[in-house]
A protein has these predicted regions:
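Secondary-structure boundary elements
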Residues: 24, 151-153
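Extracellular/virion structural assembly segments
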Residues: 2-16, 61-65, 72-105
Length: 169
């Protein structure tokens, strides 16, 4: 395994890592990704639900920042009697996700060439906003903007292009 395959992460790596964290968290029952309007909130969906909504990617000379909206939601009783409890539980799970990216050993792989080093970088502070929606089920939870920065290399040496001719016209 080359050092580059460890350091430079693709969109697939970033999404799959977020999904894995959600799938391994013992309090999350369903993990989905894609546009927020594609969430299936039918009565057969298992909750709490963790949804990853891609927003955009910012590419810089040495880094790529993947911007997401992360949703964590659970069912609310028809009379909303458990809304405070649901909000509290979902907020703790959101806090867990931040903690895993800040300090979680499951995001590190030791490699003799690269050593143990961060592969994913996140901000220090997050604003997490509550929401309530009524579909087939009434759900409440939290949404936060979550930016994941990874190393990037804008290197023309590895581009699969026929460079036998110059493209300047």
């Amino acid at each position: 395994m080359s050092v580059d395959s460890i350091r430079y992460k693709s969109y697939n790596n970033v999404i799959d890592t977020l999904k894995c964290i959600g799938e391994k968290h013992l309090n999350i029952k369903t993990v989905t990704s894609g546009d927020i309007w594609t969430i299936d909130l039918e009565k057969n969906t298992l909750f709490p639900l963790f949804h990853i909504n891609p927003v955009n990617v910012t590419v810089g000379l040495h880094q790529r920042t993947f911007n997401f909206q992360l949703f964590l939601m659970d069912l609310v009783e028809p009379d909303s009697s458990n809304e405070q409890e649901v909000l509290s539980d979902c907020l703790e799970i959101m806090n867990d996700i931040i903690a895993i990216y800040k300090h979680g050993e499951i995001l590190y792989k030791f490699n003799d060439e690269a050593g143990e080093e961060d592969r994913y970088f996140i901000n220090d502070d997050f604003t997490i906003e509550p929401f309530t929606e009524e579909y087939d089920n009434a759900v409440t939870g939290w949404v936060m903007s979550f930016a994941i920065t990874v190393e990037n290399e804008l290197n023309t040496c590895n581009i699969p292009i026929d460079n036998t001719t110059i493209c300047v016209k």
